[in-house]
Design a protein with these regions (language model features):
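Non-catalytic pre-domain segments flanking phosphatase-related domains
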Residues: 2-7, 11-63, 71, 76-107, ...
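A metal-dependent, Asp-based hydrolase signature
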Residues: 73, 80, 88-205
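Short, intrinsically disordered, charge-biased short linear motifs at domain edges
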Residues: 4-13, 116-117, 361-366
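Charged, low-complexity surface segments at secondary-structure and domain boundaries
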Residues: 18-27, 61-64, 150-151, 162-168, ...
Length: 409
């Protein structure tokens, strides 16, 4: 991809303080990406301050497969199943407003005989294996073990029911207890060799996670340069809080999926954002929902306005992500957008089109994807609409992005 100068330049009269040392990024980046990122730090960092309307320029990172390899939500779900920490609901339909009757019945058949409502299901035991398999299937494939559709009726741009369902299955535990579960899963997954598989029920699942050294270094240097660094993730809030400590991001700078609480314990309902009230369970940190939550938590925008693009001075200058779920908050970044290539259609269409010169693409740092052998279908089906209908990917001016060849791998 052609290099481009950051367009939102710092004021010409700003000069570096003579006693100020700008942090320097380590090597390990593709092409000129390190230079582009260093330029961002040099231009917006505290040694050459750029302050649109905040004390610090904002940088926002997705978490799973952006800062770490693999998914900490998955790691937590598998740990919960292996250790019998999911409490049986009285009615599985209460765990998600999008759960289909077929899925609720399959879960009840496999799980309900094993425990009383409100008590943990023994999914880590031989007698609980079928229950573990059913939960894992619904979570991992959005279908039952027999292939019945597990979720229906959701907005594809504001929520992913399976992601939310993990958070909802934490019902009955306190946030502190969930953080302890996440810490145990973290210890296991970081200690496991790369490529490890673990048994969950009668099946196997990914059993390892790694922090990306390059992203840890980038976050450290952004913070040292005076950036306000945030994490926006579609994994549960307490889980991401635990993992984010490993890159020096504190809990008050983590925006994950958030449950409502009752008597200090998590419920099956979710906090809302923008025009979506708490308990409506339809606006999580997912695609357009990430914009809403970032606007709300980082920039203090309240009400329906949080769902809208904000003026440049009230947006992040930098964003990093790896998936179509990140595309909206990446587009909102005003200076630079880092994409880790996982062959996701809409995201790669926009990144390779690079219509404003602010996108940079990097292969995954561990086990990078091979080159996609066919072009990304930008002009036909690369975009997923609110109702799930595929459509062309369009630029801000509504022109259609042509199909793109995969060139960074």
């Amino acid at each position: 991809m052609a290099a481009a100068t950051l367009t939102a330049a710092a004021p010409a009269q700003a000069t570096a303080h003579p006693a100020c040392a700008t942090p320097e990024l380590a090597a390990g980046w593709y092409g000129d990406n390190r230079a582009r990122l260093q330029q961002l730090i040099d231009q917006y960092g505290r040694c050459n301050p750029y302050r649109p309307s905040r004390d610090k320029p904002v940088a926002v990172f997705d978490w799973d497969n952006t800062v770490v390899k693999n998914d900490v939500g998955d790691a937590t779900m598998f740990w919960l199943l292996r250790n019998g920490k999911i409490r049986r609901p009285a009615d599985w339909k209460t765990t998600s407003r999008y759960l289909t009757p077929a899925a609720a019945q399959a879960l009840a058949t496999a799980c309900d005989p094993l425990a009383l409502p409100g008590t943990p299901l023994p999914t880590g035991t031989p007698e609980g294996a079928a229950c573990a398999d059913e939960v894992a299937a619904v979570y991992g494939t959005s279908a039952t073990r027999t292939g019945a559709t597990a979720f229906a009726g959701w907005d594809r741009r504001t929520i992913e029911p399976a992601y939310a369902w993990l958070t909802q299955l934490l019902q009955g535990w306190t946030p502190g207890q969930v953080r302890a579960f996440a810490a145990a899963a973290r210890t296991e997954n970081l200690a496991a060799p790369i490529g490890t598989k673990q048994q969950v029920g009668t099946t196997t699942a990914t059993g390892w996670v790694r922090y990306y050294d390059q992203q840890r270094d980038l976050i450290k240097n952004l913070q040292a340069a005076g950036f306000d660094v945030w994490i926006s993730s579609a994994s549960p809030q307490p889980v991401v809080e635990v993992w984010a400590r490993g890159v020096g991001v504190t809990a008050d700078h983590v925006i994950g999926i958030r449950n409502t609480t009752r008597d200090g314990k998590l419920t099956t309902h979710l906090q809302g954002c923008g025009s979506v009230a708490d308990g409506a369970d339809s606006m999580i940190t997912y695609v357009d929902g990430k914009r809403c939550w970032i606007n709300k938590e980082v920039f203090g925008v309240r009400g329906a306005a949080a769902e809208k693009v904000q003026p440049a001075a009230r947006r992040q200058v930098f964003a990093a992500g790896d998936s179509d779920t990140d595309v909206t908050f990446l587009r909102d970044a005003t200076a630079l957008r880092l994409v880790l290539n996982r062959n996701k259609n809409e995201l790669m269409c926009r990144a390779y089109d690079n219509s404003d010169g602010k996108w940079i693409v990097n292969p995954m740092f561990i086990e990078p994807k091979k080159q996609k052998t066919t072009p990304y279908p930008c002009s036909t089906t690369g975009y997923t609409g609110h109702d799930g209908t595929p459509a062309p990917v369009r630029r801000a001016d509504t022109s259609v992005i042509p199909d793109q060849t995969d060139t960074v791998f």
